[in-house]
Amino acid sequence: MNAEKSPENHNVDHEEIAKFEAVASRWWDLEGEFKPLHRINPLRLGYIAERAGGLFGKKVLDVGCGGGILAESMAREGATVTGLDMGFEPLQVAKLHALESGIQVDYVQETVEEHAAKHAGQYDVVTCMEMLEHVPDPQSVVRACAQLVKPGGDVFFSTLNRNGKSWLMAVVGAEYILRMVPKGTHDVKKFIKPAELLGWVDQTSLKERHITGLHYNPITNTFKLGPGVDVNYMLHTQNK
């Protein structure tokens, strides 16, 4: 099954889906195209768990879960995890890897808007990592995430800022020079300024709690969280 056979929805970019379908079989290859995701996952997981006050016993939704790197790690923390994605092949990889790892994650091929229509207010934590820049209407995703979380629950977003530096680092550097990710992975026009994301958040029931940058040092080949949101950044919000 390919991206064109996925359920129809206005907020799906089939070209974006096809990119990830093509490399889905290598999602769990620690030295493959998704090596950066494996490298930053401990940072993402640590940030989410700390800001949410732990994940054990919580009901968590991972929006745009892909092959399940973050979803599995949150399940290992004791969360009950549902992973959403519109890519059939990435979900098949995620399901197989979870089975092989003995990890329980419920993977669903569905848009977040469709899921919100049926499961509003059911999750303690919602995560949406590196997904907003891959859909036609990211504001619609933000609205749906707000609808899905319980009162007092936590919603986390991560994406890329839109400016010259992020183009140099995430496109020229990561795709063409360092070849950390496949060429064509990113479109700088789809990157999202923090002010834009915060503006969408302000139009929902969510409230900003914390924002941090995710930084890569090519000399030491390491990632870290810290001040500065000029390239990659993560946002923690909470439902009012």
UniProtKB/Swiss-Prot annotation:
One example GO MF annotation: polyprenyldihydroxybenzoate methyltransferase activity
Record bears the keyword Magnesium: no
Catalytic reactions of this protein: a 3-demethylubiquinol + S-adenosyl-L-methionine = a ubiquinol + S-adenosyl-L-homocysteine + H(+); a 3-(all-trans-polyprenyl)benzene-1,2-diol + S-adenosyl-L-methionine = a 2-methoxy-6-(all-trans-polyprenyl)phenol + S-adenosyl-L-homocysteine + H(+)
EC number(s) on file: 2.1.1.222, 2.1.1.64
Keywords: Methyltransferase, S-adenosyl-L-methionine, Transferase, Ubiquinone biosynthesis
Binding site for S-adenosyl-L-methionine: R44, G64, D85, M129
Top-level lineage group: Bacteria
Pathway recorded for this protein: Cofactor biosynthesis; ubiquinone biosynthesis
Gene Ontology BP annotations: methylation
Family the UniProt entry places it in: Belongs to the methyltransferase superfamily. UbiG/COQ3 family.
NCBIfam families: UbiG
Function in brief: O-methyltransferase that catalyzes the 2 O-methylation steps in the ubiquinone biosynthetic pathway.
PANTHER family found in the cross-reference section: METHYLTRANSFERASE (PTHR43464), UBIQUINONE BIOSYNTHESIS O-METHYLTRANSFERASE, MITOCHONDRIAL (PTHR43464:SF19)
Protein name: Ubiquinone biosynthesis O-methyltransferase
Gene encoding the protein: ubiG
